[in-house]
């Protein structure tokens, strides 16, 4: 299995629109693309990323198919209008918490 790890900070003043996008567009559409969401963390204190999220696929080919899908590219571009310090990486799933 492979895991998509995403981290970002929500831009100040964008919180309401960001939450609306996250709940009404990003999460449902990513699930429809075939990504099984596994993690969603909100960091309130410290120097780390404000948001950490993850999702898995059965194999690398499925992950690559999702990430090359035009719908994913549109979602990612829209997410970038609400966030700073965006980071995306794909790793092999270890079963524990991954950064």
What is the meaning of each model-derived region?
Residues 2-8:
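Active-site-flanking beta-strand signature of metal-NTP-handling nucleotidyl enzymes
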Residues 9-21:
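Short, surface-exposed ligand-recognition loops at beta-strand->loop->(often short) alpha-helix junctions
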Residues 14, 61-63, 96:
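Residue-level signal for secondary-structure boundary sites
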Residues 20-38, 56-91:
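An amphipathic, aromatic/His-enriched active-site/gating alpha helix that lines ligand/cofactor pockets
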Residues 40-43:
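Short, solvent-exposed loop/turn elements at beta->coil junctions and helix N-caps
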Residues 45-49:
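Short acidic/glycine-enriched loop/turn segments that link adjacent beta-strands
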Residues 91-99:
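Short, low-order "capping/linker" segments at domain edges
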């Amino acid at each position: 299995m492979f895991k998509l790890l995403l981290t970002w900070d929500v831009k100040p003043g964008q919180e309401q629109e960001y939450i609306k996008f996250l709940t009404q567009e990003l999460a449902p559409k990513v699930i429809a693309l075939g990504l099984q969401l596994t993690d969603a963390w909100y960091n309130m204190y410290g120097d780390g990323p404000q948001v950490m999220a993850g999702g898995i696929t059965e194999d690398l080919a499925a992950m690559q198919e999702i990430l090359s899908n035009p719908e994913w590219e549109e979602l990612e571009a829209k997410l970038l209008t609400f966030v700073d310090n965006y980071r995306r990486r794909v790793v092999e799933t270890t079963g524990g918490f991954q950064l």
